[in-house]
Amino acid sequence: MYSSDAPINWKRNLTITWIGCFLTGAAFSLVMPFLPLYVESLGVTGHSALNMWSGLVFSITFLFSAIASPFWGGLADRKGRKIMLLRSALGMAIVMLLMGLAQNIWQFLILRALLGLLGGFIPNANALIATQIPRHKSGWALGTLSTGGVSGALLGPLVGGVLADSYGLRPVFFMTASVLFLCFLLTLLFIREQFQPVAKKEMLHAREVIASLKSPKLVLSLFVTTLIIQVATGSIAPILTLYVRDLAGNVANIAFISGMIASVPGVAALISAPRLGKLGDRIGPEKILIAALVISVLLLIPMSFVQTPWQLGLLRFLLGAADGALLPAVQTLLVYNATNQIAGRVFSYNQSFRDIGNVTGPLIGASVSANYGFRAVFLVTAMVVLFNAVYTGLSLRRTGATALPAQDVEKDDTSLVR
């Protein structure tokens, strides 16, 4: 379709990867509204057993993703990022299809683990775009790309619930597999990458990857920052609906109110992420990162004292606007400190820390709420984010944020990457 030596239009690749991240985010979240119902349909009975199995099938995907991500990242640095996008999209499509055919809970659990092993579309999309964009536009591009997964994750539960009510639980898995296969086709036909495969013996080992970074200590601290961001985000998820019900009292549309309050941070992040990413390109992503963490602390504390669902919704909207800058700012700093040759592994390591946060965050939130009540979760989360802000600030001060090379700053907005 394209000449192999033709220049790569990174903006077109950004558009297609955004669509791919949107479809992947939607596909993952399509099944979330009825996951416990599907577990129940596979023969799990009893309140405690249903809770346990629902938690297992949810968390095992992130756990196995954390294990597999470094392997896929290394393979991406050897074979190219496009082939990893194709592998991920097609693999997840096949697994989703098989999930719709599962006959018992053990089969479903194994398939959820396999989904984590074969995933990784979004981190590989980040790595692909990070190696093709002009460095001085990293914040804007990665911020824009992040909105793809966020918007898909917002739309997915709504569409998934409607589809499950209309067609039943199993057909939704087949529809999800179709969405992922569409993602595979779009990637195959329209994503372009010029990549020279690297022999395995020439690949850097993990220690050499870390040593080759411009600022290894800063990058390691950014991995920890990513983990804490996800812990803070996930800690609120298990108790949000119950907290909203306590605030709302006896109202008929509690599910609608809870859904609205759950989704408003994502809507705010869609608006803020590209804009704050672009601002970070001008003033430095490290400033955006610290400011967003501090603002998050100031918004989390009053959430513990709200009296109505709408007060909580307003604060969560503002929190989403701040949170929309966090991961893109981290990713931009990673781009500044890693060469293209190791970008796949750096982003995959970051994804592993993110997955660990996705697993541990809900556990922490559920534990705190069980012992100290719903309101305490927001105060504990605020303390976690405050620690993150202080830790990140000290790490940036000790290591210094790496400035953009002058030649990157001078590139024109319409640059094509060869």
Curated annotation (Swiss-Prot):
List the InterPro entries hit by this protein, alphabetically: MFS (IPR011701), MFS_dom (IPR020846), MFS_MdtG_subfamily (IPR050497), MFS_trans_sf (IPR036259), Mutidrug-R_MdtG (IPR023692), Tet-R_TetA/multi-R_MdtG-like (IPR001958)
A cellular component term from Gene Ontology for this protein is: plasma membrane
The UniProt entry lists membrane topology as: Multi-pass membrane protein
Does this UniProt record's set of keywords contain Transmembrane?
Answer: yes
Protein localization: Cell inner membrane
> Keywords, A to Z?
Cell inner membrane, Cell membrane, Membrane, Transmembrane, Transmembrane helix, Transport
Q: Which residues cross the membrane?
A: 19-39, 56-76, 90-110, 113-133, 144-164, 171-191, 222-242, 251-271, 288-308, 317-337, 376-396
Instruction: List the GO molecular function terms.
Output: transmembrane transporter activity
Q: Which PANTHER family match?
A: MULTIDRUG RESISTANCE PROTEIN MDTG
* Family, as annotated: Belongs to the major facilitator superfamily. DHA1 family. MdtG (TC 2.A.1.2.20) subfamily.
The name this protein carries in UniProt is: Multidrug resistance protein MdtG
- Which organism's genome codes for this protein? Enterobacter lignolyticus (strain SCF1)
Q: Which gene encodes it?
A: mdtG
